[in-house]
Curated annotation (Swiss-Prot):
Probable thioesterase involved in the biosynthesis of gramicidin S. It comes from Aneurinibacillus migulanus (Bacillus migulanus). This is Gramicidin S biosynthesis protein GrsT. The active site is at residue 95. SUPFAM superfamilies: alpha/beta-Hydrolases (SSF53474). InterPro entries: AB_hydrolase_fold (IPR029058), TEII (IPR012223), Thioesterase (IPR001031).
């Protein structure tokens, strides 16, 4: 497989903007694909290239077997991303994507001795806080679907479509297994700012659990709360984008 086809396999909209001076890598939530961030590139300045990471089992990679181990995901993506971190870069991850972005940034730091310029984590408690429940992926279908319903991220019409759910359930179980099997390990905090985004009505991710991300950086830290539940990033995306643009422009500003 050529370099270009391999990049296009894992990263959507990558290396297409010759004016880019910074890349923002976006990692979706459990069960989600790169299309979750499809429109975001339209709202960032041309100096910032917005790339979505596409994991196996999603959308155009739907025929591939989903990965069920976070470390395996991180090791593969950390290798594939190397040609794209030739300019400053940042991560945005939502829910499961926040956990992946955190461990991916750690692995890149270890392998390449470079930090992202900013880590944006969304809809996920700090990694050092154990999950209250880790075995969602082992639940019978009916109970598992009820858990999905409580998160309010899957339309009811889809949850009630047996044929559609037969396609989605293996992917969703794989992703919940990724989160449920995660084991946090202590390491040095990052030398980059971290921003934690949360939904004011997200009962599963409290302000306090977002505030705990502070332990993971030696630099600036902030929590931004927006209207909405666990999937607030849809109704509050413009506010999130405005905040991220402001933070990333600080990186691009000429040093005097």
């Amino acid at each position: 497989m050529t370099f270009i086809s391999q990049v296009n396999k894992w990263f959507v909209n990558a290396n297409v903007n010759s004016a880019a001076k910074l890349r923002l890598f976006c990692i979706p939530y459990a069960g989600g694909g790169a299309s979750a961030f499809y429109e975001w590139s339209h709202f960032f300045p041309k100096e910032i290239e917005v790339c979505s990471i596409q994991l196996p089992g999603r959308e155009n990679r739907g025929a591939e077997v989903p990965l069920t181990n976070l470390q395996q995901i991180v090791e593969i993506v950390a290798e594939e991303i190397q040609p794209l971190i030739n300019i400053p870069f940042a991560f945005l991850g939502h829910s499961m994507g926040a956990l992946i972005s955190f461990e991916l940034a750690r692995t890149i730091r270890q392998k390449s001795n470079v930090n992202p310029v900013h880590l944006f984590v969304s809809g996920r408690h700090a990694p050092q806080i154990p999950c209250a429940k880790q075995d969602y992926h082992l639940l019978p279908d009916e109970q598992f679907i009820q858990e999905l319903r409580s998160l309010n991220g899957t339309p009811e019409i889809v949850l009630q479509d047996a044929e559609m759910m037969s396609i989605l359930l293996p992917r969703l179980r794989a992703d919940f297994s990724v989160c449920g099997s995660y084991q946090y390990k202590n390491d040095e905090p990052f030398e980059c700012p971290i921003t934690a985004f949360g939904g004011k009505n997200d009962n599963g991710v409290t302000y306090q659990s977002l505030e705990a991300w502070r332990e993971q950086t030696k630099r600036e830290f902030s929590v931004c709360m927006y209207p909405g539940d666990h999937f607030f990033l849809y109704e509050s995306k413009y506010e999130m984008i405005e905040f991220m643009c402001k933070q990333l422009r600080l990186v691009l500003a000429p040093k005097i």
